[in-house]
Amino acid sequence: MKVLIINNRFYPINMIGAFRIEAFAKYFQQAGHSVTVVTDGEADEMKLWSGCNVYYVKDPLITLSYRERCVKEGKKWVLRRIANGLLVRLTADGKFIWRWKAYKKAASLCEANSFDVVLSSFDPLAPHIIAYKLRKNGYKFYWIADMRDEMSKSIFKSRYQVRSLIPYERKIVNSSDLVVSVSEPLLKDFKRFCKHDNFLEIKNGYDYEEIHDVYFQSQFTMAFFGHFHRKWVSPANWFKAFSELIKEGELPSDSQIKIIGNRFKLDVPQDIASNVLLIPPVVHSEAIRMSLEADTLVVIHTTGRKGVYTGKLFDYLATNKPILALCDPEDVIAGLLEETKAGFTVDNADIAGIKKMILRCYSIWKNKEVLPRDWEKIRQYTRKNQCKILLDYLANVQKLT
């Protein structure tokens, strides 16, 4: 089977969205299929990655490295970023210009290869539009629309962007042969626009060897990996609960919080400023190693956002460290932690509850306990096993047999 993957995030990008698509490419190739990738890059070039041909197409407007430099240097109002922001408002697609170049590359590859399957992934909109245009222009293939994030249901989008995305969402889910997403609640959202019933849940998963040996730090240490969002994801209640516990003498005064990878300014209470370590972003393999240097791994999930497993949650699963999730106790993260026995959930608005759960994690550290994880349940969430779900599904598709 010949497979074309169209996506904006791929190696060497250090992001969960890239890791998901890399897993599709890697495990499809290992299953004996020919895999070609068209993705965003710093230059127009072709490289070999894990046996896959990867065609990088440079965005004429703004590259990822340029955007990262602007964010790091606090350059918000530069011409290219302003133009990119206008594109998002006018077209609902910040990769509007890139997609014209990428379509030409994808079309030329279709002419040469006659792909059996095309997998496109959102966000941004561009990969789906390229796949849709390929189909409209007569290329025959089985189209998998990977919706790793919400489209019109996203709480991160403005009302104008939501209105702009709805017709695209309807067009994509109805034109594709299979819609894939990371959770059943998200699939349910996409079904409201769809005339067919071809939907499949493929979670993000983890892709490293599980770790059973547990090392306890000399001082109680909690860690958060990733970045916060000024409006939607805040550590304020975590900090407040932590601060109160230290004041009350319930936690040792030398207890630590490590924040690894956050790019936004944080308001750390002065009384715990010396307890909070801010560490710049690191590559994924280093993040996994650093997670072993914590006693509790923290998830803070977006207030009001339903049905989404934050990608770091799966990386946390195989570390054998307790996971503390500040999120909706009725949502999917809570269900996953209960199923795998890997940690605890508390509502992010419940300060008293957060304090109680921090103390529970502290007790585990103090008594050098290890949670009785259900490793069989956890192993189903390796990226390899999640990709196998899709491979098994495709093996039964009549169009491909």
Where are the language model's segments positioned?
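N-terminal subdomain of nucleotide-sugar transferases
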Residues: 1-62, 178, 187, 245, ...
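Membrane-proximal helix-turn-helix segments that form the acceptor-binding/catalytic region
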Residues: 23-24, 100, 104, 126-129, ...
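A conserved catalytic-core segment of Leloir-type glycosyltransferases
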Residues: 40-101, 109
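Acidic donor-binding loop of glycosyltransferase active sites
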Residues: 177, 291-308
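Carbohydrate-associated surface elements
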Residues: 185, 202-205
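Conserved donor-binding/catalytic core segment of Leloir-type glycosyltransferases
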Residues: 215-233, 239, 386
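Nucleotide-activated donor-binding/catalytic signature segment of Leloir-type glycosyltransferases, i.e.
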Residues: 251-255, 261-288
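A charged, aromatic-enriched C-terminal amphipathic alpha-helix characteristic of glycosyltransferases
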Residues: 349-353, 363-396
